[in-house]
Regions:
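N-terminal hydrophobic/helix-forming segments and targeting peptides
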Residues: 1-174
Length: 174
């Protein structure tokens, strides 16, 4: 989207940097956004084929159970699963009063054993991200989706780049 609007470069971390110079001696201004999102990393696959994971970013365990997730393998293949834990009917009365510890959760892929999960290309280190369809809610000006805070920053940086005409700055969209 920056092509033709700014000089584009890349850094060693994978950032895309657009530079638009109005006055080469003018002040430098940057609007930065980021496209990352919170998720998980595969740590192990159990003999039963369940995927154990560790968080990448901040998560609140109370909202995780029954959430659909996507594992992206190193080859780019996407495998869908759902977060599960010990069934409520086998929890002790004391366990039912507490949030489920994230370490007790797993991703259920609907496979019968570890071998089936491995055949799907899943291995430790693969990323796991929430599967959430981006949709408009009942009032169409309200949207549901994941990582909006991240993507809005990128959109703002691009919008400023689009709207910037004559200026005395060095503008960076990162």
């Amino acid at each position: 989207e920056m092509a033709g609007k700014a000089t584009v470069s890349f850094d060693n971390l994978g950032s895309v940097i657009g530079e638009k110079v109005g006055n080469k001696n003018g002040p430098k201004i940057m609007v930065a956004g980021h496209m990352d999102e919170v998720g998980f990393l595969v740590t192990t696959i159990t003999d039963e084929g369940y995927v154990k994971f560790t968080p990448a970013g901040g998560w609140w365990s109370q909202v995780m159970l029954a959430q659909q997730m996507t594992i992206t393998t190193s080859s780019g293949k996407e495998v869908r699963g759902v977060i599960g834990a010990k069934a409520p009917h086998i929890l002790t009365p004391e366990e039912r009063k507490k949030p489920v510890d994230m370490k007790a959760m797993y991703l259920d892929l609907g496979v019968e054993n570890k071998e089936e999960a491995v055949k799907l290309g899943i291995k430790p280190g693969d990323m796991i991200t929430p599967f959430i369809e981006a949709i408009a809610l009942a009032n169409k000006k309200y949207l549901l989706g994941k990582a909006w805070d991240n993507r809005v920053g990128c959109a703002a940086a691009m919008e400023v780049l689009d709207d910037l005409k004559d200026h005395d700055n060095i503008y960076y969209a990162v």
